[in-house]
């Protein structure tokens, strides 16, 4: 009887050991990963070069919370949950968890921006800095009615970051926009970038540096001709014809317009 019990215990113990070996717990997995040596990774990357780039992209932000970026920088290359920071010393993506600037920042949603677009005819003075960027060019105004994305991006940025200046232009019979951030030191919150990306389907949106300013450029690549979004463009044009552009704004427009020729 005793022998039988001992055999049962031993077989049960072997069974449990077998299960543990087949399914290592979290601590064992972690221990296994820590045993990987640099030459092991090097051997893997030699066989699969594409994994090296993925590995580097994964580890950069968690280690320092920051990753350097090159300009021009397309928002299509933006890492989720990171802010963008520009200065004369460095241009970086910063992990939201490591960001010290965004706690009190309120960013409009893409839906807020669309509502504002639909109401822009009745809120011309409220949105006057947007309309200054058209320099009373009625053809550009007409084009803007078919491209709500332009207004939405301006609205999101303008309500998040102060001291910006839009300049509208035509490229390939589509409306484009430069937003000039009038400082070389700039922090763009993660949520602001997220909302811009949410509305910019069919557009190329990128950041660059011109002299002492950071420039956000919006270029339309694919125009949505099936949009059901309409505004009273005739009434809008009439109001803009009557709107005065301050001399200071006109001078600034001419200054930036000269610098931005050929920039896009």
From Swiss-Prot:
<dbReference type="GO" id="GO:0046765">
    <property type="term" value="P:viral budding from nuclear membrane"/>
</dbReference>
<dbReference type="GO" id="GO:0008270">
    <property type="term" value="F:zinc ion binding"/>
</dbReference>
<keyword id="KW-0863">Zinc-finger</keyword>
<keyword id="KW-0597">Phosphoprotein</keyword>
<dbReference type="GO" id="GO:0044201">
    <property type="term" value="C:host cell nuclear inner membrane"/>
</dbReference>
<keyword id="KW-1043">Host membrane</keyword>
<feature type="zinc finger region" description="CCCH-type">
    <location>
        <begin position="83"/>
        <end position="187"/>
    </location>
</feature>
<keyword id="KW-0479">Metal-binding</keyword>
<comment type="function">
    <text>Plays an essential role in virion nuclear egress, the first step of virion release from infected cell. Within the host nucleus, NEC1 interacts with the newly formed capsid through the vertexes and directs it to the inner nuclear membrane by associating with NEC2. Induces the budding of the capsid at the inner nuclear membrane as well as its envelopment into the perinuclear space.</text>
</comment>
<dbReference type="GO" id="GO:0016020">
    <property type="term" value="C:membrane"/>
</dbReference>
<keyword id="KW-0472">Membrane</keyword>
<comment type="similarity">
    <text>Belongs to the herpesviridae NEC1 protein family.</text>
</comment>
<dbReference type="InterPro" id="IPR021152">
    <property type="entry name" value="Herpes_UL31"/>
</dbReference>
<feature type="region of interest" description="Disordered">
    <location>
        <begin position="1"/>
        <end position="22"/>
    </location>
</feature>
<comment type="subunit">
    <text>Forms a heterohexameric complex with NEC2. Interacts with capsid vertex specific component 2/CVC2; this interaction directs the capsid to the host inner nuclear membrane to initiate budding.</text>
</comment>
<protein>
    <recommendedName>
        <fullName>Nuclear egress protein 1</fullName>
    </recommendedName>
</protein>
<keyword id="KW-0862">Zinc</keyword>
<keyword id="KW-1048">Host nucleus</keyword>
<feature type="compositionally biased region" description="Basic residues">
    <location>
        <begin position="1"/>
        <end position="12"/>
    </location>
</feature>
<dbReference type="Pfam" id="PF02718">
    <property type="entry name" value="Herpes_UL31"/>
</dbReference>
């Amino acid at each position: 009887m005793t022998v039988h019990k001992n055999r049962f215990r031993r077989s049960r113990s072997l069974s449990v050991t077998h299960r543990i070996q087949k399914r290592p717990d979290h601590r064992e997995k972690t221990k296994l990963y820590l045993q990987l040596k640099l030459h092991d990774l090097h051997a893997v990357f030699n066989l699969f070069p594409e994994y090296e780039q993925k590995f580097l992209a994964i580890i950069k932000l968690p280690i320092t919370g920051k990753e350097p970026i090159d300009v021009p920088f397309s928002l299509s290359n933006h890492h989720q949950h990171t802010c963008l920071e520009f200065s004369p010393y460095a241009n970086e993506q910063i992990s939201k968890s490591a960001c010290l600037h965004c706690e009190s920042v309120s960013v409009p949603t893409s839906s807020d921006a669309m509502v504002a677009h639909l109401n822009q005819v009745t809120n011309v003075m409220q949105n006057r800095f947007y309309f200054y960027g058209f320099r009373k060019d009625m053809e550009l105004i007409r084009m803007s009615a078919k491209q709500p994305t332009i207004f939405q991006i301006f609205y999101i940025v303008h309500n998040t970051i102060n001291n910006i200046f839009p300049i509208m232009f035509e490229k390939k019979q589509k409306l484009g926009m430069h937003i000039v951030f009038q400082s070389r030191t700039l922090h763009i919150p993660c949520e602001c970038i997220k909302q811009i990306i949410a509305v910019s389907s069919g557009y190329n949106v990128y950041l660059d540096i011109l002299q002492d300013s950071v420039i956000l450029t919006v270029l339309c690549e694919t125009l949505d001709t099936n949009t059901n979004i309409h505004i009273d463009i005739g009434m809008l044009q009439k109001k803009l014809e009557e709107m005065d552009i301050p001399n200071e704004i006109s001078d600034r427009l001419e200054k930036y317009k000269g610098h931005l020729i050929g920039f896009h």
